[in-house]
Amino acid sequence: MAGEELVRYLLHMWNYPMCVPLDPSAPFDLLVKGENDWITIQIKHSIQKTFKLKREGGGKNTRTYKTYQKGDFDYLFVCQFPYIYIVPWDHLKAASCFTFSMYESYRHDLTDEKTYVNKVILEKGRKR
C-alpha cells in the first residue's frame, strides 16, 4: 500500500485526475486522465533487485497467479524508495519479471524536489 500512496501523491503533484477501479480484480491499480486519453497504471514495490510481475487472485484458501498481458495496463510504476520507476508497457523487456538495473533511464528520485514539478507526460503508446 505504501507504494500506491507514493504514486497517488506524485500524480496529484503533477495535477493528474485519477480514480481507483471498483473491481478489485482489475489488472490495474489506478485510472489516470493523461494528456489525451485515460491511462491505466499498475503499481508495484520491492526491496529486491528483481521481482516477478504477477497478478494475484483467488479466495480465502487459495491463491492464483497470472502473468500480465498486453492491454492489462499502460504504465508500470515501481517503487523502490527513494526511487520510482515509470515504465510504459511497450518498453517492458519482459512481462513476467522486473529488474531495476534494466530501467535506470526510467528512474525518478523522490528526494529531489524537481521530481514533483517536472511532470512525466503520460500518453497511450508512448514512444521514447
Where are these regions (language model features)?
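Mixed-charge (Asp/Glu-Lys/Arg
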Residues: 1-26, 31-128
